[in-house]
Amino acid sequence: MIHVTRKTQLPEEFTLKKIRFIAGDVFTTMGKPGDASVVFTNDDEVQLLNREYRGIDAPTDVLSFPSDEIDPETDIRYLGDVIISVDKASAQSELARHSLEDELTMLIVHGCLHLTGLDHGTPEEKSFMKEKQESMLKALHIKDYLWPEDH
């Protein structure tokens, strides 16, 4: 199950069902079924987490905290947490001239790809992750977005 926490306002059309579908689709496509959490919050909270876990005292658009624990009671894998700054997403959507919903979708896909083990630390990793992300966004009918450079 995809657990969703909304600590800030989201677009009305960005429903729990849609959020769960997007994240679940990433995990299914990548062959990594399991549970995860997606949290929508503000710049202040993301900045605190970014400082605490990455040593960067600034907000960012999305943070991913992979896990690979298996619940002993249910035998279901917990893939981790994706934390999204809606403030940052809103600013980026304006810059890219697309909807906040499209930006949030891109950030969910990007964050969930990290939970499946993908990264962009090397040029090869970045190329592979970008290819996967573009393919998934295309399937979701989203084509114009900026690649997140700062996370």
What are these regions (language model features)?
Residues V109, L113-G117:
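Short active-site segment of divalent metal-dependent hydrolases/proteases
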